[in-house]
Every structure is written in C-alpha cells, then in structure tokens.
Design a protein with these regions (language model features):
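Ligand-binding face of N-terminal immunoglobulin V-set domains in extracellular IgSF glycoproteins
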Residues: 45-65
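Hydrophobic helix-coil surface modules that form long, contiguous segments used
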Residues: 46, 137-143, 150-310, 339-342, ...
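Solvent-exposed beta-hairpin/edge-strand motifs
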Residues: 58-82, 497-499, 503-505
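Hydrophobic alpha-helical and helix-loop surface patches within well-folded domains
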Residues: 70, 80, 195, 224-483, ...
Length: 858
C-alpha cells in the first residue's frame, strides 16, 4: 500500500506541476546581460536585452523569474516598441509580459530593467564571504538562473550570451566568455568588464563571479586556462592547473572535437553547495575539491581533485556542447561525465588505479537501486523540487556503470567512435536518450539501443544465479537466471527482465561474453573451468553463486575481489546467504593488499557489528574482529613510518578504524589517541594518507581537552581546506555525550558555513554511537536547520543519512516527522530512508539468531 500511495502522490505532483514548464510561444536566440552587484548591500541591478523568435502572433510572452523586482519592460517587433505590463506568478517562478497590440510572428526584442538580491542560500546569484571580503558568485543549475536574470530557464532554450559587469574598483570579474575590455566607470568607484559572446548554451550554464580573485595561468593546445582562488589560497592552485592542462589535451583527442568554449577558468568559491559546477568556460568548485597543498596532501585528496576536475571538464562536451532536452535525461550529462572522469585520470596517473574507485563508486548506485522505491535512470520530473532529487547515485554512478558495461562488450574503439559521432551530430544543440542510443547503434552496428533502453527505463539491479549443467567439448553449458534483487530477498515480487552483457572469466584470464535477455537461458562458455561471473567487475549486476562461495580463487584482480566482496555482502544483506559466509570471505581477505577492499570490509563489518550483533554477543564479535584483523595490523605496524607507501598507509588506516570501532581494541584506541595528540604538535609525525583516520579514531576516547584542541586547530586552518576538514569531520567521532552535543550545536553556529552543516550532520548519522542523538537534534532544530540551509542544499543529505537508523520504531518516527514537515525536494529521499531503516530491521531479525550461534563457536 505504501508503494501505491507514494506513486499516487508522485503522479499527482507531476500532473499538477506541468504548468511550470514555459508555454512554447517564444524562444530566445541571444541575451545581452548587464549586472551591477552591490556586495555590501547584498543586492544587484540588472539590465537585459533578449532577442526572441515568436512562434505565432501574441500579446504576451512568458519567461522565468524568481526573487526579481521588475522595472520598465519594453518589447519591440516589426519596428514598433511597446511598454509591457508584468504579471508575476511567484509559485511557478514565471513572469508574463503583456503588450496592448499583438506582436507578429517572427523576431522581437525584449528590454528589461530589474533588481535582485544576492541571497545567502547558495543558489542563483548569491553572496559568499572570506577573509573579511565579499564575493558575488553563481550556481544556476538546475533552475536558478531565473534568480539572476529573467530568462527561458529550461535546458532546451539555448542562446548566445553577451555579459557585462560593473563592479567595485579593485575587484575582478569572471564569466563564461573571455574578457574583451575593462574600463573605468561609468559610475564613480566602479569599472566595467565586458566579456566575449558565448556559443549557444543553456541558461543553467551561465557563470558570474565578482570579488578579489588571484589566478594562476597556463594553456593546453591553444586553450588559455586559469585556476583562481581567494588570494590566500593561490599557492594551492598548481596541481589543479597541471591536471587541467592534461585533461583538455586528453578530451580533445578522445572526442576528436577541440575544446568548444575558447578559454577555461576554474574557480574555487568559499561558499558553494555543490561539489563543482560545469559552467561553460568557467567551472566553479567547492574549495576542498580544488585546492591541493603541494607540501602536504594525500594521494586520496589529489586523486579526488583530479577526478572531480576531470568530471567537470568532460561536461564541457557532455552537457555544455550537447545538452539534454529536459531534466528527465540528466543522466546524459552526469552519467557520461562520471563515466569519462576516470579515463582522463587513468591515462595521466595509471599508478592511482582509478578503476578501483570507479568500481567502488558503483556501490553508491547499487545502494540506492536495491530499494523497491528506486527510480529508473530516466525519470519523469517537472518541478524544481523533483528535478533536484534526480541528481543522485542513479543519474551519476549507475549510468556510468551501465556505460562501462556496454563499452566493454562493444569494444572501446567502436564505442568511442559512436560517442564522437553523437557529439558532432548534436553540437550546440539538445539531445534525448533516444538520440544517443540511436546514433550509437548506427555507428557501432551493435544493439546498444536494446541494452541501454532496457537499463535506463527500468529501476533495480539485476541479480544472476548460475548452474553449470554440463561440459561438452571443453565448453560449459551454464543455466543463467536473472531477476530483480530485493533487500527482502523476495525476487519473485517484482518480475523484470533486462537486456545486458554478462562476461565470464576463467583463471587463465580469458573472458567470454553473452547477452542476457530472458528470465532464464542457457549460455555456453569456454573452457570448462571455474569462472568469475563478472569479468573485471564491469557488469552492472550482482552474482549469486550457488552454492555460496567464501573463497577468492575465482577473482583474480583487485577489481574482481572488490566485486566479489560486494556481491556476497548483498546476498547477506538480503538474507539470501547466511551472514557467516560473508564473515568467512572477510577472513580470507584480511591480508589483501588493496586498501579499498579493507575499507569495504571495515564498512560492511561495521554494519554487522552495530546493527545485527546482539548486545550480549558484542564481546564475541569484537574478539573475532581482533583475532582476524589484529595480526594484520601488527604485521603492518602502528604507527608505522610517515614515509610508508600510500597503499600501506591506506591498509593501516582501514584496519585501525575496523579494530578501533568494531573490535573495541584498547591498544589500537590508545595508540590512535597518542598519534592524534602527536599530530596536533607535529603533523609530519603521521603519514598524510592516514591522518584523517588517526584524528577520527583518536577522538573515540578523546576527552574535553583533546576536543578543545581540535576546535582550536580549526581556527588556524582557513587557508588549508584539506587539513581543515580532517579536523572538522573528526569532531563527530567524539563518543562522550556532552562533546557529541557540543558538535551538534556547533553545526548551527555562524562560523560553520551552511555548505558544511548538512555534511556534518549526515556524517554523524552514519556513526552508530551518534545517529540517535543526531536524529533527536535534527527534529528539535528543524526550523533552524531549514532556515540556515534552505530545502535544496544540506537537507537532502541529512534525509539520506537517516537511512542509517535501524529499528521499525525509528522508521515510524521518520515517517511521522516528515508527514508533518514535508520537504518536496526530498520526497523520494524520505521514502528511501524509511525503506533502508525497515530493511535494516528485517535483516537484523533474519540473520542475528544464526550469527549468534556462529559467534558462540568462534
């Protein structure tokens, strides 16, 4: 019933919201925009001239506008200029301009004078602050360009843009186009910066930045590149510039299309709700995802910066050059950029093994996709709230995983040719999913349309079971059954069939692929030998080995071992396999040399310890953790040497967290606290690739004195984003109830940026010792949280964090709370959080009795 009720509500919203799309009566071809921001007054003045084409004669034109105060408006057509009356529709964020005499079909020009606010909600044209200075910056995606200038704020309405900014003397201006001129005036104490006309692009890609910026310059194959920051962080921009230079070259070559927007500016912003934003020619970033300390940064931080930058630069082709027609195809933007991001990084730094990160990221999608409330990749959306919700693991990581799977089957060269042809065909235009897979099918000659459509239009994760029937002539006949994986284990409840390739690999490294397109079918694979059912971990499906296996001989590579761990985890999570099978597998991988595998085990075993192990069985479980993983850490050594290889530090860090949190290892906890104390005095005393974990595990037994030292340290780190967030994120790890409450209250302080409040609370909801207190705090402080964050930034993350609760009573509490405090931008998120909580309670009930018996024997 709940599923039906939710669907009914969602359909009602969508139907009621159809009017929020603009009427198809006019379309813009060019905007000339002039802005005069008042940083001290947190307002701006604007003037714009919009060239439009009218589809038919009309007396009115409707466009988007929100939080805009209109001044005089005129419309000129066929040589006649008329003053327009403005009628606002605040609910739908539209303005209708009406003139006395009908405008003829064809060309017309609108001129608008208006004012707006530089808001504090990190959307549209907004205010950011740092070092006593103010900055005016933008974040337009998805539907907030209308807060900066009246416009056709839908992706299908592409136009060119001329931008001018009149700003305070001494400030810098950045926009999408290259700077053409910078002249004094015309007002006292001001100067006007004029930018080159852009190619045709959607409104959500417009960028405006004003303030005291310092930039580092370079170029790549004729494209000027700058990485810009507040002046105090300029020394942290070198790594991003180096990465961008390589990535532009890589993408020029891969796509066979030269970078399409002339120049590229990359700007770090102190207050920024997204991770980064692909504005054409002017990419904006959250500072911690762009700046790298050349003297002291972890490989993980550098890899993250390079990967996020690669994602945004890929968007200059996927999303900016070719843009989806409507937001239901956002996967054409985000999924493709996610798929591409690792390619450029892998070519530049093969030693980073980013294919492991890509495989690990797929789990974010699977975590969402195993829910019965999961959405298909392509989902009908209408309102800004619904649009906001589809920027999720399904759009990003699931799409990327699907593309990797199909690419592996078709072959990288053929797939690349199809991509290049698609981008060339739709350059500076809009495209749909049908446009993409039709072109890919035409170029490759492979049934990509059948595969992609099957995977894009259905929710859920396929799970395959295998039964080897016979071996004839060195070829195995394998009966393969596909069904939709469900956390409740009932795979017959939602019968579905996908069309996708499954690739099997034997121990000699040879793979054979078959298209799976029926509920049950027999496939042939050579030779007759044990095989791993997801070669190189490239398939977007789960493998249910029957009988269940707890050995790793079938998985030959790191990626395959990671895939095996996660496959077996989901079998245990749904009670399809006894949970002790996963524990046996974990024991077999304790000495694995891949940090990501140990980190995955740490996360999965942490779930078991905090949600499935009975309180009375905690000592036995902790002892098993210590007995299994303690010798591994002892062999690696703790604290180890700061100069140890990154992989060694990564394994040590994962084991330290596992033993400290799930194993209750008193010696590890003591050493971690000593290391944290030493790190405060001398950061060089701890390896940079395990510093975050040292501070976190050190906090577990930390007292008021250590907490105060963490807080004091934060105040000194304004110019070191990576180090700042090491300490900031560690605050939630203090188990002392009084210190936990202090951290929760700190989240609402003015000194904590609004972009960080939601992240802190979401992270604390993930910690078993903090989740109940954090949920109580969220309920008690809901008005203050929504006032600080708004409903588009921060709140969705908090809602997703609630899925870490684990009792039916908590599920009922969450449902009741959001029935009274509805958040339209997180409707699906609330439903998914409730389902996650209920599924956690279910697996606890199903697995805990057998686990208790197993622990008593181990």
């Amino acid at each position: 019933m709940r599923k039906f009720a939710f669907t009914l509500v969602a359909l009602t919203f969508a139907t009621a919201a159809l009017a929020q799309r603009l009427p198809v009566t006019a379309s813009p071809t060019h905007y000339a925009l002039w802005f005069a921001p008042d940083l001290e007054g947190a307002t701006f003045r604007g003037r714009e001239t919009i060239d439009i084409t009218l589809a038919n004669p009309t007396t009115s034109v409707t466009l988007n506008a929100a939080e805009i105060q209109f001044g005089p408006v005129t419309i000129t057509a066929a040589g006649r200029t008329q003053t327009a009356r403005v009628t606002l529709n605040e609910k739908d964020e539209m303005a209708t301009l009406t003139v006395p005499q009908a405008l003829p079909k064809g060309a017309a020009t609108i001129q608008i004078t208006y004012t707006g606010i530089l808001n504090d909600k990190l959307r549209g044209f907004y205010l950011s602050k740092a070092n006593g200075r103010r900055y005016a910056v933008t974040q337009m995606e998805a539907t907030d360009a209308r807060r900066a200038f009246p416009s056709w704020d839908e992706p299908a309405y592409k136009a060119s843009f001329d931008v001018s900014l009149m700003i305070d003397t001494g400030d810098t201006a950045i926009s999408n186009g290259a700077q053409l001129s910078d002249t004094p005036g015309p007002e006292a104490g001001k100067h006007t910066v004029v930018f080159a006309r852009t190619p045709k692009m959607s409104t959500y890609l417009v960028a405006l930045l004003v303030g005291d910026f310092a930039c580092r310059e370079g170029s790549s194959e004729g494209t000027p590149i700058r990485v810009c920051s507040t002046p105090d962080k300029r020394e942290l921009t070198g790594f991003a510039l180096e990465a961008a230079i390589h990535q532009i070259k890589f993408y020029n070559d891969y796509f066979g299309i030269k970078y399409p927007f002339g120049k590229l500016d990359i700007i770090g912003i102190p207050d920024f709700s997204a991770g980064a934003m692909e504005n054409a020619g002017a990419i904006t970033f959250r500072e911690q995802l762009l700046f790298v300390d050349p003297q002291r940064s972890s490989v993980s931080a550098r890899k993250t910066v390079a990967t996020v930058l690669s994602h945004e630069i890929a968007h200059q082709w996927f999303g900016d050059l070719v843009t989806m027609k409507w937001w239901d195809d956002i996967w054409l933007n985000e999924g493709f950029a996610t798929w591409m991001e690792s390619k450029a990084v892998a070519e530049w730094r093969p030693d980073w093994q980013v294919e492991l990160d890509a495989a690990n990221d797929t789990q974010r999608a699977i975590t969402e996709d195993v829910l019965t409330s999961a959405r298909p990749i392509r989902t009908k959306v209408e309102t800004p709230e619904q649009i906001n919700e589809v920027f999720d693991g399904i759009a990003y990581e699931k799409t990327a995983a699907v593309l990797r799977m199909v690419e592996a089957y078709v072959g990288p060269d053929a797939f690349r040719k199809g991509i290049s042809s698609y981008l060339s065909k739709f350059a500076y235009r809009n495209a749909s999913g049908e446009d993409f897979w039709s072109e890919m099918t035409r170029v490759t000659g492979q049934p990509i349309d059948r595969m992609i459509r099957s995977l894009v239009d259905q929710p859920g994760v396929p799970v395959l079971t295998f039964e080897e029937r016979s071996c004839i002539g060195n070829a195995s006949e394998i009966e393969v059954t596909q069904s939709r994986f469900r956390l409740d284990g009932d795979r017959s409840a939602t019968p579905q069939t996908w069309t996708f390739p499954a690739c099997f690999k034997t121990n000699d490294g040879k793979a054979s692929c078959q298209v799976i397109d029926r509920p049950q079918q027999v496939v042939k694979a050579t030779p007759c030998a044990p095989r791993f059912a997801n070669a190189d971990g490239r398939g977007y499906y789960l493998s249910d080995y029957r009988p269940a296996v707890a050995e790793t001989s079938r998985a030959r590579t790191r990626v395959e071992r990671l895939t095996l761990v996660n496959d077996e985890w989901w079998m245990a999570r749904s009670a399809s396999h006894p949970i002790q099978v996963f524990l046996d597998l974990s024991r077999g991988l304790a000495y694995d040399d891949a940090p990501v595998i140990l980190t995955t085990l740490q996360t999965r075993l942490g779930f078991i310890g905090s949600n499935i192990v009975d309180t009375s069985q905690q000592p036995q479980f902790q002892r098993w953790i210590r007995d299994t993983f303690g010798p591994v850490l002892a062999k690696l050594g703790l604290p180890g040497r700061p100069s140890d290889a990154d992989d060694v530090q990564g394994r040590r860090a994962a084991l330290m967290v596992l033993l400290g949190v799930s194993g209750g290892d008193a010696d590890v906890l003591r050493r971690a606290r000593e290391m944290a104390t030493q790190y405060l005095a001398d950061p060089a005393s701890v390896g940079v690739s395990m510093a975050s974990e040292v501070l976190q595990v050190g906090a577990l037994t930390g007292d008021r004195a250590l907490y105060d030292r963490y807080v004091s340290k934060l105040a000194t780190l304004s110019t070191q984003p990576e180090e700042y967030y090491r300490f900031f994120n560690a605050l939630g790890w203090f188990r002392d109830p009084a210190l936990m409450q202090e951290t929760l209250k700190r989240s609402l302080l003015p000194t904590v940026r609004s972009q960080d409040t939601g992240v802190l609370l979401r992270n604390m909801l993930r910690l078993p010792w903090a989740r109940e207190a954090t949920w109580a705090f969220v309920k008690a402080q809901w008005p203050a949280l929504t006032a600080k964050l708004g409903v588009f930034q921060g709140i969705p993350g908090i809602v997703s964090g609630l899925g870490n609760l684990c009792t039916r009573a908590q599920a009922a509490d969450v449902r009741a709370f959001f029935a009274k405090n509805r958040v339209e931008s997180s409707e699906r998120g609330v439903q998914q959080a409730i389902e996650e909580i209920e599924s956690c309670a279910l697996v606890d009930a199903r697995q805990s009795p057998a686990l208790a018996e197993w622990l008593s024997q181990h």
